[in-house]
């Protein structure tokens, strides 16, 4: 069985042979972490074009090994709140073994092309595997236009523990700018569209990231309030959806503190 070190070397060689990215001539590193970074940079930058069977087999083995390196987090491992069907999970959304996780996408819906970028879109696309970008490309080709803010699309999660990924594009807020009612409503639409799609797909568990609060600059406090209020209102309007368990995933300590506070009924997100 080839090691991760060797698998990375073979994948890097195949990707560099294509000469599709600015990293095609970089020398092969001798350190594991450097190889991981180079492979990720190559696959992040690679256009949504078909891949060879040889590469896909190597990537499948490598990502299967990655998937086996941690214990997935299920709903029962998540923190309970004062709302029966709402849970909290503080950590890496890629580790959640739920029916679907929500990805904060961009309007191209093809993932992040910035090498080794720290956004959730990059992390999800990298470790779901390159088939995800190809699946998203197929959706965008059929759609024939950029993805609108507040809509939602469903794909397989491929190598992630989750079964599916729901992709939604949130609104951007310029730093220091007030959150307008229009942008607040657009963020709420992201949650409603994702919930509607989850029910349509027959899902029973859905994990939301903090949409728009990263690279898109939406203030965390307002975003948390909108997220929780929107989900609670949607649940009240869809009593048939009681079987859908909803998880709010937080990654920063600030987000965790906000959701911990707002998911106590007496605070009511005010």
UniProtKB/Swiss-Prot annotation:
Residue stretches making up the Macro domain:
73-267
**Keywords, comma-separated and alphabetical:** Glycosidase, Hydrolase, Metal-binding, Zinc
Q: Which cofactor does it need?
A: Zn(2+)
Q: Does the keyword Zinc apply?
A: yes
Q: Which residues bind ADP-D-ribose?
A: 92-93, 106, 119-121, 212-216
Q: Tell me which domain of life the UniProt entry assigns to the organism this sequence originates from.
A: Bacteria
Q: Which GO terms describe its molecular function?
A: hydrolase activity, hydrolyzing O-glycosyl compounds; poly(ADP-ribose) glycohydrolase activity
Instruction: Give the enzyme's EC designation.
Output: 3.2.1.-
Q: What does the Swiss-Prot or TrEMBL cofactor note state?
A: Binds 1 Zn(2+) ion per subunit.
Q: Which reaction does it catalyse?
A: 4-O-(ADP-D-ribosyl)-L-aspartyl-[protein] + H2O = L-aspartyl-[protein] + ADP-D-ribose + H(+); 5-O-(ADP-D-ribosyl)-L-glutamyl-[protein] + H2O = L-glutamyl-[protein] + ADP-D-ribose + H(+); S-(ADP-D-ribosyl)-L-cysteinyl-[protein] + H2O = ADP-D-ribose + L-cysteinyl-[protein]
Q: Which InterPro entries match?
A: Macro_dom, Macro_dom-like
Q: Which SUPFAM superfamilies match?
A: Macro domain-like
Q: Which GO terms describe its biological process?
A: protein de-ADP-ribosylation
Which residues bind Zn(2+) per the record? 112, 117, 119
For this UniProt entry, which segments traverse the membrane? none
Described by its record, this protein's role is as follows: ADP-ribosylhydrolase that specifically reverses the SirTM-mediated mono-ADP-ribosylation at an asparatate residue of GcvH-L (SpyM50867), by releasing ADP-ribose from the target protein. May play a role in the regulation of the response to host-induced oxidative stress. It can also hydrolyze ADP-ribosyl-glutamate bonds and ADP-ribosyl-cysteine bonds. In vitro, it can remove the ADP-ribosyl modification from the human mono-ADP-ribosylated PARP1 E988Q mutant, which is primarily modified on glutamate site with only minor aspartate contribution.
Relate the assembly described in the record: Monomer. Interacts with the lipoylated form of GcvH-L.
**Family per record:** Belongs to the MacroD-type family. Zn-Macro subfamily.
Name this polypeptide is given: Protein-ADP-ribose hydrolase
Q: What is the lineage of its organism?
A: Bacteria, Bacillati, Bacillota, Bacilli, Lactobacillales
